[in-house]
Amino acid sequence: MNPLLELLDVHRTYQIGETTVNALRGVSLTIDRGEFVAIMGASGSGKSSLLQILGLLDNPDKGEFKILGNNVNTLSEDEQAGVRNNVAGFVFQQFHLLKRMTIVDNVRLPHIYSGLKGDFRQEAIARLKLVGLEERIDHTPNQLSGGEQQRVAIARALVRDPLIIFADEPTGNLDSKNSAEIMKIFTALHEEGKTIIMVTHENDIAAYACRVIIMKDGLIVSDERKAEMQPSRAVTGESAFDISGSGKGSIWQDGRFTGFMAQAFQSILANKMRTFLSVLGIFVGVASVIAMMALGEGAKSAMQEQLKSMGSNMLSIRGGSAKIRGAAQGAGAVARFSFNDVNDIASLGKLVKNASGVVNGSARIVYGNKNWSSTLTGVGFDYGTMRASIPAIGRWFTREEIQIREKSAIIGVTVVKEIFGSSNPIGKTIKINRINFKVIGIAPAKGFSGPQDEDDVVIIPVTTAMYRVLGKDYLSSIFVEVASPGLMGQAKTAITELIRKKHRLEEGDDSFNIRDMTEIQKMLSSTTQTMSLLLGSIAAISLLVGGIGIMNIMLVSVTERTREIGLRKAIGARKNDIMLQFLIESVGMTISGGLIGVFAGVGISLILAFFAGWAVKTSLLSVVLATTFSALIGVFFGLWPARKAAALKPVEALRYE
């Protein structure tokens, strides 16, 4: 039968600064199942180093270490963690209980890393009953005495029913009464067949063991078995265990992820102020992203409405002072357009879809005791569809009304507000420059175009404006709707040639200009997109700052919880388990801040809309992007602290001061 533990010529060397310490120098040792072994020696003798290697908390530099005949030197760090979870139970001088957890949760902690499904609460309670603490299961460690805390640690060591109990100075922080109670528990466990390996420097404690090993300067100088205390006879036959380690299945299938989630959120809630400050950075960042993007989307929507009002594929032709070879001509040398020009342009075959003459002026509007100065625009029949000006309330002019110079008017919403207030203006008679007009429609709201209010307008038939109101015999401009965007260049060239030919203008005569509304639309759209990107970038920077804050907090948390990490590794946590738990904590904080920030961002954008009078639009895309980005920030900025935590060696973490 193979011995339970076997060391062959084991060496262990530590480098402390420039000093080399030979903790173990060629130690050979066998321990059988059922033995109760006490390892003694002065400080620096190597007794703790020997226990750490036997418990797979540390690895030898040289020599062989076997468990039940299996060489464990070649196992990976994760495989050794699995063996510790299956085979070993640890009791430490400092207890190493997690203060934020109840004692029953402390006891069942090793099961989280076992890869086994289940709650295991009843099993943990049974172990607490074994050490006499069944009445204290929902207490926290700081509500217990030192002796009670050590009994909780023993219950935790027993919960996985290990082959071996490793006890490192288990009574070092206890008085004589509590020490005796703890040793009675160890004695009872030994009688039941447990193998116990204990480090102590007290002779009265070592007296409970059936075998005492004394070390000095990294060597075993004495190894005595007490004749009257033989190894427990309760253990018979060979035992096997999963030497490859536990918990190798999917964390989703074996229930580990649920345990990690619970552990992570317990840690988050344990430091409420720190968590609040960490979440605050993400909250501000996400709220800024949502609010800024809502403002950007609102501006974009408003701009789109204005662009829509301009019409698509539109050319605007206006007359102006002639310039021949750069020299301005007199006022008489001005290209003035007539209805014949409109008809000629409209007849340009496949290039032009519609054309409308427009005349502009000012209007003094009077209704009852109300009067208002506004812009007067005379338009043709096709203008309504070309410039998206067909009234939502009322109707557009008929061709006959334009031909007979009918005194009908369509007024903008600003005029309605100033003249009629909340009453319906349709069918009412108003005076425009002292001439009676019947209101037949309300123009669609278009908002502001720069400083100009596009809704402060009165639209009448172009013939009426020219011959009844303004006394003009020429048009102010001609609007042309080109058949398709691809024909804009050809249409401009054809119209230019047509006007020059008809008005007998020289080649270099620029007494008229043609403005491409599509180019204006592109420019405005580009400006809006740039503004949205700028606002989003500013908000994203604040989100990144919040992420850096999360990383700082997590790095501090790793340092503060170094011993906790060491404990988790001692009871079977693998590197990925530790890393995942810290990642869950960082992502949990960022997602929490992100979700709160989403609601706050929507609220802030609505408040801005209310006070500034600027429409905002919160899109689902911005919400999804902000929330997803906050989660990614949790992963990105939490990865370094998580990797740092996972890289800690269990023995180094446990003795961290």
Curated annotation (Swiss-Prot):
Ranges annotated as spanning the membrane: 276-296, 538-558, 596-616, 620-640
Keyword line: Antibiotic resistance, ATP-binding, Cell inner membrane, Cell membrane, Membrane, Nucleotide-binding, Translocase, Transmembrane, Transmembrane helix, Transport
Xref: SMART domains: AAA
Pfam families the record matches: ABC_tran (PF00005), FtsX (PF02687), MacB_PCD (PF12704)
Topology in the lipid bilayer: Multi-pass membrane protein
EC number(s) from the headed UniProt entry: 7.6.2.-
Leading EC class: translocase
Annotated binding of ATP, by residue: G41, A42, S43, G44, S45, G46, K47, S48
GO molecular function terms listed in the Swiss-Prot or TrEMBL record: ATP binding; ATP hydrolysis activity; transmembrane transporter activity
InterPro entries: AAA+_ATPase, ABC3_permease_C, ABC_transporter-like_ATP-bd, ABC_transporter-like_CS, MacB-like_ATP-bd, MacB_PCD, Macrolide_Exporter_MacB, P-loop_NTPase
GO cellular component, one term: plasma membrane
Residue span(s) of domain ABC transporter: 5-242
Subcellular location: Cell inner membrane
Gene Ontology biological process terms, A to Z: response to antibiotic
Subunit and partners: Homodimer.
Its job: Non-canonical ABC transporter that contains transmembrane domains (TMD), which form a pore in the inner membrane, and an ATP-binding domain (NBD), which is responsible for energy generation. Confers resistance against macrolides.
Listed PANTHER family: ABC TRANSPORTER PERMEASE YTRF (PTHR30572:SF4), MEMBRANE COMPONENT OF TRANSPORTER-RELATED (PTHR30572)
Family: Belongs to the ABC transporter superfamily. Macrolide exporter (TC 3.A.1.122) family.
Listed name of the protein: Macrolide export ATP-binding/permease protein MacB
Species in which this protein is naturally found: Chlorobium phaeobacteroides (strain DSM 266 / SMG 266 / 2430)
